[in-house]
Amino acid sequence: SSAAAQTTMDDDAAPEGDFNSSSSEAAPSDGAYLGIEDVRVGSHDGYDRIVFELTGEGTPGYFVRYEDVPTQQGSGKPISVDGTAKLVIDLRGMGYPFDFQMEDFPSDSVKPTSTSVIKEVVGAGTFEGQTQYVVGLKGDKTPFKVFSLNNPNRLVIDFQSK
């Protein structure tokens, strides 16, 4: 695992680095204790983007990978999400919603209409310091990249679109 790339830019800025279909992993910063304020999905020229806006202290870690049948942490129950390929995102270094005066982190299904490859994003809860989301994609396993942004603190996943 490597340190997460840290960049300051707005949600629309084009990212650096290469797209890849293999799993991507990074450890959270020491003492990271984060909550999720917002989940946004957008379409850009050449890529679709998911932004997790965070609150709390530190930089998030993550484990992002494709799974044929995504299952919930802890329970092992299958997670239902629209799409052919399914990408599982575990955000690491997370607290629980009540620690941030929230009833829950954003978990409602997001079904964007303007995206090329993202069909649905579903929140699957927090368990032992990890908050899980599953992304359903149109078509095959789409190359992606994961990185962190500052001011505000965000974790970003970009999906290459045709």
Question: Where are each of the predicted segments found?
Answer:
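Short linear recognition/processing motifs and adjacent strand/loop elements at protein termini
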Residues: S2-K162
